[in-house]
Design a protein with these regions (language model features):
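Active-site-proximal loop/helix segment associated with metal-binding centers of metalloenzymes
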Residues: 1-8
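Ligand-binding pocket segment of bilobal, Venus flytrap-like solute-binding proteins
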Residues: 11
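Charged catalytic cores and adjacent phosphate/nucleic-acid-binding surfaces used
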Residues: 14-17, 21-22, 28, 32-113
């Protein structure tokens, strides 16, 4: 078809490098949705700098596991409501889901050179 553009795939390491080279901080979002803890750990070993450990769809065990991985790999801990503006889609509204200050403050630290 004339308008077809073939898809291409980047490896995780390439994406991580692109983010870092653009001045960003690569964070693994929604690790539970990967459904493969070995793959999550592999991604964490390849330059990811943070993990979304705090997420409304995580149970207590999930949150504990991802906080432990963050500590093991010296990662930033992030979290979010995953609210996309559709009322009623999620159990909470924007601003109702928060991340403890002890994790948020790490996001404001100057990077070590």
């Amino acid at each position: 078809k004339p308008a077809y553009v073939s898809h291409y795939r980047l490896e995780a390491e390439e994406i991580i490098d692109l983010i870092k080279n653009s001045g960003g901080t690569p964070v693994l979002a929604h690790p539970k949705l990967i459904h493969n803890d070995a793959l999550v750990e592999e991604l964490l070993k390849n330059g990811i700098e943070g993990i979304e450990a705090i997420y409304p769809k995580h149970d207590e065990e999930d949150t504990k596991r991802y906080l432990e991985l963050a500590e093991k790999y010296h990662l930033l801990v992030t979290g979010g409501s995953d609210f996309h503006g559709i009322p009623g889609r999620w159990p909470q509204q924007i601003g109702e889901f928060v991340v403890d200050d002890c994790y948020a403050e790490e996001l404001y630290r100057e990077p070590e050179l």
